[in-house]
Regions:
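Transmembrane helix-loop junctions at the membrane interface of multipass transporters and ion channels
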Residues: 108-116, 134-144, 172-175
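Membrane-interface interhelical loops and short amphipathic "cap" helices
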Residues: 43-54, 107-121, 177-196
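Signature of multi-pass transmembrane helix bundles
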Residues: 1, 14-19, 141-224
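Hydrophobic core segments of alpha-helical transmembrane domains in multi-pass membrane transport
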Residues: 1, 28-35, 66-77, 92-104, ...
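Juxtamembrane helix-boundary/capping and inter-helix hinge elements in multi-pass membrane proteins
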Residues: 6, 10, 14-22, 48-56, ...
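Helix-loop-helix junctions within the multi-pass membrane cores of secondary transporters/permeases
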Residues: 22-99
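Transmembrane alpha-helix boundary signature
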Residues: 2-11, 34-46, 105-110
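Structural signature of hydrophobic alpha-helical transmembrane segments
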Residues: 54-66, 117-130, 199-211
């Protein structure tokens, strides 16, 4: 993270802010928010656990869009120097109201998974990038409270996936059939381990590849 995602976040944040193009800043932050979330290993694990009630791809991109939208809100908070407490209070009230609606509809078992999805924003890829992005934007904008203004981005982004998954849960049907994984050593340990490594490597390379390609295009077209 220190070698890749943190410098990338600072570079993107400062470069886009210097362009003075708010629409471009919002669009890029949304896309990067989606891509870094999709690349999170934690999200893949969560999606596999609830595949019986929600399609894994739908859940992954729903959470990604939630993070992307709230990353945009967090960035706009920095740009317009709005109160973090007021924004958090408003969206928490919305979140609890939607949670009550899920309970009324009889899908209370859906809520733990929805709130657990917020943990994706504490992953090893997402956190360094979001924090560095905020620091880069706040430092470029400047001002007496630049450091304080960049505070709270991860807290805001954690709301996005929770709200997104709760919205999925309002009309969801079925039951969560979670089974504890079998951690016993298989007879063909080497073959099983190799298969798992190859499968995981493919997922990680695909997700990180999207980030690399998007950053390369951004570097050539906007940040040059």
């Amino acid at each position: 993270a220190d070698v890749a995602m943190t410098p990338m976040g600072e570079h993107v944040g400062s470069g886009l802010t210097k362009s003075k193009n708010l629409l471009l800043l919002v669009a890029v932050c949304f896309i990067m928010g989606v891509l870094i979330t999709v690349a999170e290993p934690d999200l893949t694990v969560l999606a596999s656990q609830v595949a019986g009630i929600i399609d894994s791809t739908v859940l992954i991109f729903t959470v990604g869009i939630g993070v992307g939208l709230f990353l945009v809100i967090a960035i706009l908070k920095i740009v317009f120097k709005k109160s973090l407490a007021s924004i958090l209070m408003f969206f928490y009230m919305v979140m609890f109201a939607l949670s009550a609606l899920v309970i009324i509809n009889g899908n209370i078992g859906f809520l733990p998974m929805a709130y657990d999805s917020g943990g994706v924003t504490t992953g090893p890829i997402t956190v360094p990038f979001i924090m560095a992005l905020g620091v880069g934007i706040a430092a470029t904008i400047g001002g007496r409270d630049a450091e304080e203004n960049s505070f709270g981005l991860v807290a805001l982004c954690s709301i996005g996936p929770i709200l997104a998954v709760i919205l999925l849960g309002i009309d969801a049907s079925g039951t969560l059939d979670y089974q504890i994984p079998d951690y016993a050593i298989a007879d063909h340990f080497l073959a099983a381990t190799l298969h798992l490594l190859v499968h995981t490597a493919k997922e990680v390379l695909l997700a990180l590849g999207l980030i690399v390609v998007f950053f390369a295009v951004l570097q050539v077209t906007v940040l040059k």
